[in-house]
Amino acid sequence: MLSDDATAALRARLDAADYTLDAVLDRLGEAGRRGLERNSTTPARDALGAPSADDPQATLARLWILQDAVEAVAVSSALGDVVGPLVAAGLLVPDDDAFRAAAVVRPYGAEATASTPAIAGWICHDPLPNLDGHAGAPRPDHVLGISPASTTLAQLSIRRPVASALDLGIGCGVQSLHLAAHADRIVATDLNPRALDLARITTRLSGVDADLRLGSLYDPVAAETFDLIVCNPPFVISPPAGARLTYREGDLPGDELVRRVLVEGAGKLNPQGTMQVLCNWAIVDGEPWDERLAGWLRPTGCDALVLQRE
């Protein structure tokens, strides 16, 4: 994957191109932003104007946000000596006299709150498979970018200062960017090696110090406890047979993965610690919707606040 030196050089190139959230959103305009929310790149492409090797901001937006094949001369002008390491790491793919992105680098940010400063950085994740109506299938180890679920968790998470935080299932790394604003120490885990590779780029580009570890659930932190645990697990309940996408559904039957996240997580909390999780759980005929969760959580001795939505 990308070395520390190459990541630092990439960040310098992103800064030089003004490839930041506010600048790019301003460049795309309202029509471009709304189009991308619908997975349509046409309004954004119009806003960026004609391709030019003298416009590194537009070049990077075309390469990573619109997922275009971009002329090699323009990519080289925007990224300079970083092109070689990106190709060697498999993050940039030659395509005749152009380059395509095999992983996306997007600017990210969040406004300051009463308890945390503003966040500014970049997120690295896999390309969107359905941009502009394309029907491409994601790779089994696909690393999802910013989603409504990850945004919801970031918005709901308690932001009081803590000494230690666990990002369980780091994915692209967005929760760790938020944790860095109020946690002295961050440990982040994932069973998907590609997720750790891309999250490492996310955290290093964004100046976040996180201890990234490979492993399933709480295995990588067996001897540790935390003040805060956040988790957006692969909670989709799917039929027992069929292919799985690592980011979406686990290998355990039904809602067993969610049960383990909650029950085992209770034992990983320090006194007065908090765990915040997005999840699905099975609702069984004849059983109140909350009884299944209560049966899991009562033996832990923890208080639980459950918000249910359709």
Stretches found by the model and what they are:
Residues 200-201, 241-243, 289-291:
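Short amphipathic alpha-helical segments
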Residues 139, 147-231, 237, 282-284:
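Conserved SAM/SAH cofactor-binding pocket of Class I
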Residues 75, 153, 232, 261:
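Residue-level signal for inorganic ion chemistry
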Residues 1-131:
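N-terminal auxiliary segments of SAM/dcSAM-dependent transferases
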